[in-house]
């Protein structure tokens, strides 16, 4: 597999997987030995390193590109073949370095017509055909029918947009919101810990919130690891009475707070009468447990299912969803006309200002009529 990575934070990039092909070219018996050129083969290469090898090879073999032959009836020399192949690898690596630099460390795609845009799945793809289009992730925070804070991000996931939006809110108003209510796209371990650290209550749904609260069969399913009974010795007891013993602990990739998940393996699934309902593979079942995250989920459910939480959820649906509804369907603004992140941000800010002025005028008009 071919991958690129940054070497020690420097402007040099190495190419994994590329080394297998380049090593084959450079270390073949007799390929460069007859020239007297000694080249150290590696599993990783940089464009600068390949250019140096290419230059040394051209100097050693006295290569003149003007004398190269092409087309039918012409037989390339061994030096020309190896030189062109090495040059092809060098140019390809430069191309990949440029593309990965444009992408940056926080995304894995970009549009050729707008390098700041990221390919995302659109809501209008009703049939789920995996239609990916270049887009930006627009985030708003609504209060009293006004757009209080707005942010434009390149992240595909809403979870990654929560912290920057809250920091922007604090930058504007000098404090964090007490009850940041959000839909299931924002509830994650990172965001819950962030709320704890900054004095915010956990009122963001998690991805399985609806299923957890509305489907009794799923919530009370005895074969879910969270419903296993804890044993006195730290094990988990399945419905058949078998013990799940601790196997290992694994860090979650990309988690900024050092979140870890524990894996437990059943001592013996042989002869289990619930095998078809409990597991699919033939080997003993292994489950993943994160007790801290499960406690957070329980706290979120208690918050949102309370009367106060129900009122906050209703208010969010009216204000946040209503704001997008007015902008997209009443004003027919469904697509940005500018490119580049700064220009798109400017356009969204102007639309938001227009929305707030519209709301302000309506409120004054209603107040005047009521008076």
Name what the model sees in each region.
Residues 22-23:
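Cysteine-centered motifs
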Residues 10:
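Alpha/beta catalytic cores of group-transfer enzymes, especially the acyltransferase/condensing modules
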Residues 1, 5, 26-371:
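Anion-binding and metal-coordination hotspots
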Residues 13-15:
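Tryptophan (W) side chains
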């Amino acid at each position: 597999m071919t991958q690129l990575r940054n070497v020690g934070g420097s402007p040099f990039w190495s190419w994994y997987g590329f080394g297998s092909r380049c090593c084959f070219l450079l270390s073949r018996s007799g390929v460069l030995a007859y020239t007297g050129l000694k080249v150290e083969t590696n599993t990783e290469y940089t464009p600068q390193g390949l250019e140096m090898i290419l230059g040394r090879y051209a100097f050693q073999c006295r290569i003149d590109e003007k004398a190269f032959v092409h087309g039918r009836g012409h037989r390339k020399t061994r030096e020309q073949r190896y030189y062109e192949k090495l040059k092809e690898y060098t140019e390809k690596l430069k191309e990949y370095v440029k593309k990965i630099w444009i992408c940056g460390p926080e995304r894995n795609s970009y549009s050729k017509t707008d390098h700041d845009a990221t390919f995302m799945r659109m809501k209008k793809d009703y049939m789920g055909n995996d239609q990916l289009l270049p887009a930006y992730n627009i985030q708003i925070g609504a209060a009293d029918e006004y757009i209080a804070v707005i942010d434009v991000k390149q992240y595909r996931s809403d979870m990654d947009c929560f912290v920057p939006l809250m920091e922007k809110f604090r930058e504007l108003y000098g404090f964090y919101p007490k009850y940041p209510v959000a839909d299931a796209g924002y509830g994650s371990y990172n965001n819950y810990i962030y709320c704890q650290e900054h004095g915010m209550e956990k009122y963001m749904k998690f991805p399985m919130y609806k299923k957890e609260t509305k489907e009794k069969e799923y919530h009370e399913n005895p074969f879910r690891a969270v419903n296993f009974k804890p044993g006195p010795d730290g094990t988990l007891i399945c419905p058949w009475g078998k013990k799940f013993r601790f196997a290992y602990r694994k860090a979650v990739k990309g988690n900024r707070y050092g979140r870890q998940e524990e894996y437990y393996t059943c001592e013996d699934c042989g002869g289990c009468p619930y095998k078809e309902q409990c597991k699919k593979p033939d080997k003993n079942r292994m489950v993943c447990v994160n007790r801290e995250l499960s406690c957070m989920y329980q706290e979120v459910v208690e918050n949102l299912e309370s009367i106060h939480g129900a009122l906050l959820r209703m208010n969010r649906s009216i204000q946040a969803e209503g704001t997008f509804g007015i902008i997209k369907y009443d004003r027919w603004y469904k697509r940005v006309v500018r490119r580049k992140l700064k220009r798109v941000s400017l356009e969204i800010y102007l639309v938001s200002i227009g929305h707030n002025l519209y709301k302000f005028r309506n409120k004054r008009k209603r107040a005047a009529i009521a008076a």
